[in-house]
Amino acid sequence: MKLLIVEDDKLLQEGLLLALSHEGYACDCAGTAKEADALIGSAHYSLVILDLGLPDDDGLALLSRWRKNNYQHPVLILTARDKVDDRVSGLDVGADDYLAKPFALTELQARVRALIRRNQGSSNSKIQVDNITLDLNNQQVLLDEKPVVLTPKEFAILSRLVLKAGYQVHRELLHQDIYAWNDDPSSNSLEVHIHNLRQKIGKDRIRTLRGFGYLLTKGEQP
């Protein structure tokens, strides 16, 4: 899954990038409203973390434009504006959650997970497809109730496939889930991750849809 961090404080931006990358998210970063607008128009994000005090525009105005342009993905406001009126304004403009600075990193991570679950239509952090159980909160996978060790990118790929089990998933969407815009993945890197996943959960569980992407089988014997 890919996140967009819109924060002009470089030190905080780097801290958020490091913490969320360790959680298994691919992250893009923007320090201005202009940069954020350009990235929003070029990639699919599971969630946006938005600071309000940007150097070239107010974050609320930016969010208002996104909502008017029908950008419906979750937005978490992260700001030093901590008055009740500020929170009400942010939520009324279209934010899905509001967290004031200073904040506990563990709380931010929990809110990110909750917003992504809500957007995916599930309040339960555990999702089961046949003999595969995915725990989004703890980033753990069970196969026949036994733990399977995955890398962060493997977990991100499997998460997308499990959430869309039985349906085809375009390879470009999987690329966006695991790579930031400035990454330079090799042309077959996704295939390598898919190969490794097949070794861990069963080679027939993930089907290749030639010229399109992949599909996780559901409700059938592999």
UniProtKB/Swiss-Prot annotation:
GO terms for cellular component: cytosol; protein-DNA complex. Member of the two-component regulatory system PmrB/PmrA involved in regulation of virulence. Unphosphorylated PmrA represses extracellular enzyme genes. Phosphorylation of PmrA by PmrB relieves such repression, which leads to activation of extracellular enzyme genes. Phosphorylated PmrA seems to repress expression of the pmrCAB operon. GO terms for molecular function: phosphorelay response regulator activity; transcription cis-regulatory region binding. It holds the Pfam family Response_reg. CDD domains: REC_OmpR_PmrA-like (cd17624), trans_reg_C (cd00383). It is found in: Cytoplasm. The modification 4-aspartylphosphate is found at D51. Residues 2-116 form the Response regulatory domain. Keywords: Cytoplasm, DNA-binding, Phosphoprotein, Repressor, Transcription, Transcription regulation, Two-component regulatory system, Virulence. Phosphorylated by PmrB. Its main location: cytoplasm. GO terms for biological process: regulation of DNA-templated transcription. This is Transcriptional regulatory protein PmrA. InterPro entries: CheY-like_superfamily, OmpR/PhoB-type_DNA-bd, Sig_transdc_resp-reg_receiver, WalR-like, WH-like_DNA-bd_sf. Residues 124-218 bind DNA. The gene is pmrA.
